[in-house]
Design a protein with these regions (language model features):
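Short, well-formed alpha-helical segments that are part of the catalytic scaffolds
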Residues: 11-26
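Acidic helix N-cap motif at the loop->helix transition within catalytic regions
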Residues: 13-17, 53-61, 109
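Conserved donor NDP-sugar-binding/catalytic core segment of glycosyltransferases
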Residues: 108-140
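Catalytic donor/gating beta->alpha subdomain of glycosyltransferases that bind UDP-sugars
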Residues: 118, 133-136, 180-242
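Terminal low-complexity segments of carbohydrate-biosynthetic enzymes
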Residues: 210-211, 219-299
């Protein structure tokens, strides 16, 4: 019996799309699927944290099938912890468990595919949907950046992988206690698993709506780098994990043979370089406890 935890901060423009995709998948799940009776067994909790909009009301409109919790305290990891505590308190500490960002839309068939992959054996396992970046409403520089980012091997294997989704079985969730108050929650979880225990599910796709403006892209990119610096202090990288080493070379070898990719590669490389500088500046200016939020992709 699966459970889903969705932290949501001012997601009024995306939470309905997120929930509708989950429930449509549940209703349409065929009876001969290995994950039978999905709708009857699915438990969803949405944690609306520090919201100034009607995220909670829109989630409640889906009825009793969605548990909605509200908290005035902001922070994604706090919201996730509150959601998991709520499940335990209600006797619904069920697995596999999907952690899903409130602005992510899973394509049909993705949820059953992830459940089947997460339940393939009793050993610890973490899986994620494959991200599909939607830059259709973004500026040209943002679109060029994501043309390059599509070649980043991080998004094509393992879990988490930048899709705003990851699912663990019970043995996998036992690898850590509560989520620490850090920015890079997904990388924290990733480091709890060996590379052989992490997988991107080929039959699952998550629509990731990217920033619309180049300014927003730079800010979010710096935030991610800032989170990585912070994480290294509390949870060093695994010895058996290559991490981001070699990413530049992989992307360069994939893009440079085709002259049509050159503008995208130049912009992608520039953003990756600048984000290092801006993340250090952000750390000096405001610390690492702020959940920066891209509003441009949510309108």
């Amino acid at each position: 019996m699966p459970s889903i935890v969705i932290p949501a901060y001012n997601e009024a423009n995306g939470i309905e799309r997120c929930l509708r995709a989950l429930l449509v998948d549940a209703v349409d799940n065929p009876v001969d699927n290995p994950v039978d009776n999905l709708m009857d067994n699915l438990v969803i909790v949405v944690v609306a944290n520090a919201c100034k909009d009607d995220t909670a009301a829109r989630a409640r409109a889906f009825g009793n099938g969605v548990i909605v919790i509200e908290t005035e305290q902001g922070g994604k990891t706090n919201a996730v912890n509150l959601g998991e505590r709520t499940l335990r308190a209600r006797g619904l500490d069920l697995y596999p468990r999907l952690f899903l960002d409130g602005d992510i839309e899973l394509l049909p068939g993705s949820l059953p595919a992830m459940l089947a992959a997460a339940q393939a054996g009793e050993s610890p396992r973490i899986v994620a949907a494959r991200p599909r970046f939607d830059a259709s409403r973004s500026s040209l520089p943002v679109r060029l950046f994501y043309q390059g980012e599509a070649f980043n091997p991080y998004h094509r294997s393992g879990a988490p992988n930048g899709s705003g989704t990851f699912m663990v079985n019970a043995a996998g969730r036992a690898r850590w206690d509560e989520f620490p108050a850090i920015l890079a929650d997904d990388s924290f979880v990733e480091r709890r698993f060996a590379p052989s225990e992490r997988a991107t599910v080929a039959g699952a796709t998550a629509i990731v709506r990217v920033p619309r403006t180049f300014t927003a892209l730079r800010r979010i990119s710096a935030r991610k780098r800032l989170g990585a610096y912070e994480l290294d202090k509390v949870a060093p990288p695994r010895a058996d994990d290559r991490g981001s080493a070699g990413t530049f070379g992989v992307v360069a070898r994939a893009m440079l043979p085709n002259p049509l990719h050159w503008p995208a590669f130049v912009l992608w490389a520039a953003v990756k370089s600048v984000e290092r500088f801006e993340s250090r500046a952000a750390a000096r200016k405001q610390g690492t406890d702020r959940w920066q939020h891209d509003t441009t992709s949510r309108t």
